[in-house]
Amino acid sequence: FEGGQTIVADAPYELMPMYIPSGAILAYGPQIEYVDQVPANEITLEVYAGSDGNFNLYEDDGESFDYEKGKFAIIPIRYNDMEKSVTIADRSGEYDGMINDRVFNIRLHNKGVDTKIKSVNYSGKEIVVKF
């Protein structure tokens, strides 16, 4: 689909249509009801092929205003469409209670091709994942 148009689509309760641009990176953690219910030591990245994309995963303690004092972390994530690779770059920053090691489950969605999934362990240093 091209932008700048209205699309009327069936949307039954069990199947919600989503229009996601190529190059988009969507991140989510475990299902929780409150911030510190379970640590988000496993993050899923939904990466949509078709063009390059980038995303900064921002994290803080989720409870205090310490982010105003610079206590937060950012993990830059990039997708290179030509190489079909996802780079999870070096983490910058820190905060109390930060998760140092985690698993990223990366799902690459490519039009007309089965979704590919890879999992990697991340400890704050750059990792390149090739599909």
Stretches found by the model and what they are:
Residues 113-131:
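Intrinsically disordered, low-complexity linkers and stems that provide flexible hinges
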Residues 1-85, 93-111, 123-124:
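Catalytic core of carbohydrate-active enzymes
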